Each structure stands twice: as structure tokens, then as C-alpha cells.
């Protein structure tokens, strides 16, 4: 079951997000959804469907290895019924953030990313002129048994 996106704790989180421009939500994904995403990612990896990451939309998409060296797999909701519970939950998250912060968040896109040892993602601007619609980025770490000393955001 997805967390409730209402109440005092949610309101405090949205206040922090509005003030600091980021929010950390531990244990965000319900365990059953997390397991489904793990299984899906394992199949993507086993089938060698991860591609070198790039920045920019459509024809402007460019691989710049000095900015990021990870590998990604874009999620396409109509083609991935096994991830429907994930997408339904993210619909609820999008709606709750939009309502709390008075934003017009109409859509989203997701990808899975793998960072092999030594891989990186440097801060950059990739809000290209052809698309000026990004308002919020959501990063969900799927690392099992992750500890703060392992590093990362």
C-alpha cells in the first residue's frame, strides 16, 4: 500500500520541498512495488536492454560522457503492464505534489538507471529550448542494503 500523501507529516515535507527545493522520503515505495521494480530491472539488465545515458529530448538527445556515464532504460507505461502499480502510485504522488504546491503537473517520464563502479552524473542543465516543461525530478534509489557511507545523494 502506498503512503498517504496528506496530513501533518506530508505538509511538513512539502514545506521543506518548497523552501529547500528537495525532499527525502525514506522507505517511499511499498515493499511489493519495490520488489516488482527490482524484478523488472533485473530482467532489463539480464536482457542487455540498458543503453548509454544521454541528455536532451528527441532529436536533441546527445551522449556527453563528461556529464554522465550511467546506463538507462526508459519506462513506457502502455508497454509495461507489470509496472502498473508503480505508475498508479506515481500518479498519486504527482497529484499530491501538484495540489500541495499549486503546480500544474500533467505528466511524467521515468527511466531506470545503473551506475557501474566509477560511473557518475554531474550537475548540468538539460532543459532544452524545445521543451520547457520540467518542474520536478524524482529520484528513487533501489540499492539493496544501502548505507550512508556508501555515498550517493
Predicted feature descriptions by range:
Residues 1-137, 141-153:
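Fe(II)/2-oxoglutarate oxygenase catalytic core
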Amino acid at each position: 500500500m502506498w503512503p498517504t500523501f496528506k496530513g501533518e507529516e506530508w505538509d511538513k515535507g512539502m514545506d521543506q520541498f518548497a523552501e529547500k527545493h528537495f525532499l527525502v522520503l525514506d522507505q517511499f515505495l511499498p515493499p511489493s512495488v519495490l520488489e516488482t521494480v527490482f524484478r523488472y530491472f533485473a530482467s532489463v539488465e539480464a536482457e542487455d536492454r540498458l543503453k548509454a545515458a544521454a541528455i536532451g529530448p528527441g532529436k536533441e538527445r546527445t551522449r556527453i560522457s563528461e556529464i554522465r556515464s550511467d546506463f538507462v532504460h526508459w519506462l513506457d507505461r502502455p508497454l509495461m503492464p507489470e509496472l502498473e502499480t508503480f505508475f498508479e502510485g506515481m500518479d498519486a504522488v504527482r497529484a499530491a505534489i501538484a495540489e500541495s504546491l499549486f503546480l500544474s503537473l500533467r505528466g511524467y517520464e521515468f527511466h531506470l538507471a545503473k551506475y557501474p563502479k566509477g560511473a557518475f552524473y554531474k550537475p548540468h542543465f538539460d532543459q532544452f529550448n524545445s521543451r520547457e516543461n520540467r518542474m520536478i525530478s524524482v529520484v528513487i534509489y533501489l540499492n539493496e542494503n544501502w548505507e550512508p557511507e556508501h555515498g550517493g545523494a
